[in-house]
């Protein structure tokens, strides 16, 4: 039996004027090879910090987007910093189990603020969930926000 997986991202709603009925997600029938799919399941992907931190390491399928990437970086002395997401497309970043927030390559922001209190001297963990990227890229920590 064919299987169709669909990931829908909710980017918020317009909550004023005539656009109040601003539907998001799957708003019409779902078809596969011209046939309407029935009896399908919908479930949330809430991404709580503890669940993301506990994800097992594994080799990413480099042909499919929607991937979690995991890495580490060393810090001598924790300080406020910014994680530069240049090269990634759209997703969420966690450092040491803390959700830094969303990024999107359309800008204007390409750097996410990471407070010193979320870093530790020595090795730190970073997890990136990118909706479009299929291959991991290097990240860079910088001392200033976008210019």
Give the predicted meaning of each segment:
Residues 63-76, 110-112:
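Short beta-strands within extracellular/lumenal beta-sheet-rich domains
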Residues 9-38, 133-147:
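Glycine/proline-rich low-complexity spacer/linker segments in large multi-domain proteins
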Residues 109-147:
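Terminal leader/tail segments of proteins
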Residues 62, 66, 89-90, 99:
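C-terminal effector modules of nucleic-acid-centric enzymes and ribosome-associated factors
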Residues 44-69:
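Edge strands and adjacent loops of beta-rich recognition modules
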Residues 14-15, 81, 92-93, 100-101, ...:
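Short loop/beta submotifs within extracellular cysteine-rich repeat domains
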Residues 1, 14, 80, 99-123:
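A cross-kingdom feature marking solvent-exposed beta-strand/loop segments within repeated
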Residues 4, 73-96, 103-104, 126-129:
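Aromatic-lined ligand-binding clefts that engage carbohydrates, nucleic acids, or primary amines
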